């Protein structure tokens, strides 16, 4: 019998009307939960080797050269046995045919940590054109290559710049920092730089490499496609000879292997301080832990003074982990205010980007009516502390129990700053206008900001009253 349109319609209607019985396992149901458990610091089960080095390259990160308009620096990891692999580079185009790629050979160092022997590779890419999109990939073992990635070099002075600023990630990176990074990328599609102000991991307890593995998972969408500028925090250090008279701070093993940074740092802190120019801004990275605990505050201040004095850039941005003015209860970095603060004020640095205290706070400098510097403290990760009473009086806005990211846009004589929560809601916004010589003016943007956020918990799941969350 021929199937007419009418018959086809009847057959379909009959099929739709037939009852369908799904297996019980396929039906989603709410499950009653018991008491909330404390979440572990990583999602890695004991004995799991998911972050062991392999033939395929991973932990790929691009960092700024001193002149990011002409080059950048790339680091990556493989299993041991891969020596001096290649980086391939070409001007990106719309065709899969990237032409004859330029080839650069990496410098290789062995890295043995927590029973994992890896090889870390670093390449300095030079001789590039400003504001140009390049494609690059890195080599592993046996002819294995990473996927092609794309990165645009910095533009010449006079061009607009958008960048991201992140506070401490530190704890539970895969679980909690990932969503903040992804949300940040939604709000800053033109970002060319991501600046992290220290404590990227917590460190210690035989989990250091797993934590770095999770950190790279969390930041993977941006680590190799824009320049990543890291700051050392106290958790990038560890205590040697702990609880003895010889106790001292020592830089963790990952830092010099994971990052390849400009070689222009301060005396006695050369591995952890550096500067670079990008479009109209000079960025300077300090090491607060070294300044506070290793006696380099005076040397870093003198170096900072020279770097800022020699700058011809219209804007200056300084990043340091420990704040000049701490918003957290029972913290005070007086040594930084003694040595570093006068330099920041003398040069009218525009933004001082900080972390460490796991809350949010903003304040201007001690000079009344002066728009700059603006001192910022922020946090990405799950660890959340509480504000001090002094911070509530001297800073605005402030926040507890809030994961944040910041977007900064510089265009000519205007800098616009926005702090947004993990869900993208606007928490803080202001602009700096004018030039440094005549003095910048601060313009607040209160419209569309959400109300102040305060911690509503008496203690954490572990019972700590000094924290809002672990």
Language-model segments: which ranges?
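Acidic, histidine-bearing metal-coordination/catalytic regions of metal-dependent phosphoesterases
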Residues: 15-18, 22, 26-165, 186-189, ...
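Solvent-exposed loop/turn segments at secondary-structure junctions
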Residues: 80, 169-172, 200-204, 234-238, ...
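Acidic/histidine-rich helix-loop elements
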Residues: 93-120, 163-179, 202-204, 246-247, ...
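Extended active-site neighborhood of metal-dependent phosphoesterases/phosphodiesterases
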Residues: 122-124, 133-150, 209-312, 339-340, ...
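Conserved, compact domain cores that house catalytic/ligand-binding motifs in diverse enzymes
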Residues: 161-231, 236-237
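Active-site neighborhood of phospho(di)ester-bond hydrolases with catalytic His/Asp-centered motifs
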Residues: 165-167, 194-199, 228-234, 287, ...
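Active-site-proximal segments of metal-dependent phosphoesterases and phosphodiesterases across multiple
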Residues: 290-293, 311-351, 370-371, 386-389, ...
């Amino acid at each position: 019998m021929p199937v007419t349109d009418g018959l086809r319609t009847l057959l379909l209607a009959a099929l739709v009307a037939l009852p369908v019985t799904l297996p019980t396992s396929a039906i989603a149901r709410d499950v009653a939960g018991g008491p909330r458990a404390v979440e572990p610091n990583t999602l890695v089960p004991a004995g799991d080797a998911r972050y062991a080095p392999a033939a395929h390259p991973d932990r790929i990160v691009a960092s700024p050269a001193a002149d990011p308009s002409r080059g950048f620096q790339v680091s990556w990891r493989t299993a041991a046995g891969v020596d001096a692999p290649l980086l391939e580079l070409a001007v990106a185009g719309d065709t899969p045919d990237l032409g004859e790629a330029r080839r650069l050979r990496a410098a290789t160092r062995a890295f043995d940590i927590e029973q994992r022997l890896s090889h870390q590779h670093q390449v300095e890419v030079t001789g590039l054109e400003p504001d140009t999109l390049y494609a690059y990939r890195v080599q592993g073992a046996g002819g294995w290559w990473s996927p092609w990635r794309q990165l645009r070099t910095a533009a010449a002075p006079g061009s607009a710049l958008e960048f991201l600023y992140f506070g401490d990630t530190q704890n539970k990176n895969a679980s909690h920092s990932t969503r903040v990074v992804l949300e940040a990328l939604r709000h800053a599609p033109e970002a060319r730089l991501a600046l992290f102000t220290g404590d990227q991991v917590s460190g210690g307890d035989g989990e250091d490499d797993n934590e770095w593995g999770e950190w790279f998972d969390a930041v993977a969408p941006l680590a190799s496609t824009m320049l990543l500028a890291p700051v050392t925090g106290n958790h990038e250090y560890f205590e040697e000879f702990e609880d003895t008279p010889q106790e001292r701070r020592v830089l963790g093993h990952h830092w010099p292997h994971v990052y390849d940074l400009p070689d222009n740092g301060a005396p006695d802190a050369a591995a952890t301080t550096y500067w670079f120019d990008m479009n109209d801004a000079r960025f300077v990275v300090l090491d607060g832990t070294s300044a506070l605990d290793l006696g380099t505050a005076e040397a870093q201040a003198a170096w900072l003074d020279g770097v800022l004095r020699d700058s011809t850039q219209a804007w200056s941005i300084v990043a340091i982990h420990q704040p000049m003015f701490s918003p957290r209860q029972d913290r005070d970095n007086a040594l930084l205010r003694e040595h570093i603060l006068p330099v920041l004020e003398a040069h009218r640095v525009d933004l001082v980007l900080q972390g460490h205290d796991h809350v949010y706070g903003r304040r201007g400098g001690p000079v009344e009516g002066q728009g700059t510097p603006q001192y910022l403290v922020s946090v990405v990760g799950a660890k959340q502390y509480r504000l001090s009473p002094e911070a509530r009086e001297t800073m605005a806005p402030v926040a507890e129990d809030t994961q944040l990211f910041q977007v900064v846009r510089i265009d000519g004589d205007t800098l616009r700053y926005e702090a947004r929560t993990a869900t993208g809601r606007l928490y803080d916004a202001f602009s700096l206008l004018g030039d440094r010589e005549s003095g910048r003016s601060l313009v607040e943007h209160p419209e569309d900001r959400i109300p102040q956020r305060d911690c509503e918990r008496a203690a954490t799941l572990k019972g700590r009253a000094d924290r809002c969350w672990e």
